[in-house]
């Protein structure tokens, strides 16, 4: 009995040690981790809907941070961001308070021109450091020797949806982190410009009607540029599980995470 008791205690201590190591690594159970060409880790934290955190080389990169959209997010637990990217002006993507909570004088905020205009004088503290950059479709920016971003089109093409995301207003982004290419599509349908994307490792594609894509459109979009991994996101109640079947035998891995 004593031997059994000791064995139980040792097992518990081992589990506690493992849990401590996981916590100290900074990666939660909600993170997916990839490796760049030089062996650096890139991790993704799936916050909700269209909001992500990407961690790379000690940097925090926030995508479309939004506080109030349910479930409400406490961005203070993430610390200050090094980079914030905003795709467009809609409430589930653009949140001035979230940007303020995540920003300090070192934070670089990149958004489309409409959102830059909407920041307004209340957020002048961001502009005084010259750390707010408005990008338009087709523009590129070098953020560091090993980090660059391209602003790419994101818009609706179905006739009765074009008012939601008109062509030329909103951005998608292609982030290059030490050669790992990540496509954040923003709110878009399967537009022809997607066929021009190249070397995409990871793609986040939206999937909800009437604002973005159906599962069938998403599958068609993915086949246009063949990323290694596709994450459906921004999907609300859309049955995204069917994307697995739609992309079966395509060579594209589908990963579904909690991004309603």
Regions found by a protein language model. Give the residues of each.
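Zn-dependent metallo-beta-lactamase
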Residues: 2, 6-57, 249-250
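Binuclear metal-ion centers of metallo-dependent hydrolases, dominated by the metallo-beta-lactamase
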Residues: 123-147, 219, 223-260
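Active-site neighborhood of phospho(di)ester-bond hydrolases with catalytic His/Asp-centered motifs
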Residues: 62-65, 81-92, 110-113, 183-186, ...
């Amino acid at each position: 009995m004593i031997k059994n008791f000791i064995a139980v205690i040792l097992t518990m201590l081992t589990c506690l040690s493992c849990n401590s190591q996981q916590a100290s690594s900074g990666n939660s159970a909600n993170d997916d981790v990839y490796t760049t060409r030089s062996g650096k880790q890139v991790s993704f934290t799936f916050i909700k809907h269209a909001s992500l955190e990407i961690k790379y080389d000690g940097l925090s990169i926030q995508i479309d941070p939004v506080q109030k959209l349910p479930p409400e997010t406490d961005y203070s637990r993430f610390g200050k961001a090094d980079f914030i990217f905003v795709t467009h002006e809609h409430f589930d993507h653009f949140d001035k308070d979230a940007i303020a909570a995540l920003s300090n004088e070192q934070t670089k905020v990149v958004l489309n021109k409409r959102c830059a205009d909407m920041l307004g004088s209340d957020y002048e503290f961001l502009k005084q450091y010259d750390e707010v950059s408005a990008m338009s479709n087709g523009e590129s920016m070098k953020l560091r020797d090993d980090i660059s971003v391209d602003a790419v089109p994101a818009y609706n093409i179905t006739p009765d949806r074009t008012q939601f995301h008109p062509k030329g207003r909103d951005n998608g982004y292609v982030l290059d982190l030490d050669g790992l290419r990540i496509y954040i599509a923003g709110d878009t349908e399967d537009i022809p410009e997607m066929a021009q994307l190249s070397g995409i490792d990871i793609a986040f594609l939206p999937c909800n009607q009437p604002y973005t894509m159906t599962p069938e459109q998403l599958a068609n979009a993915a086949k246009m540029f063949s990323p290694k991994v596709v994450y459906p996101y921004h999907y609300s109640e859309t049955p995204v599980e069917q994307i697995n079947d739609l992309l079966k035998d395509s060579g594209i891995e589908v990963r579904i995470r909690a991004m309603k």
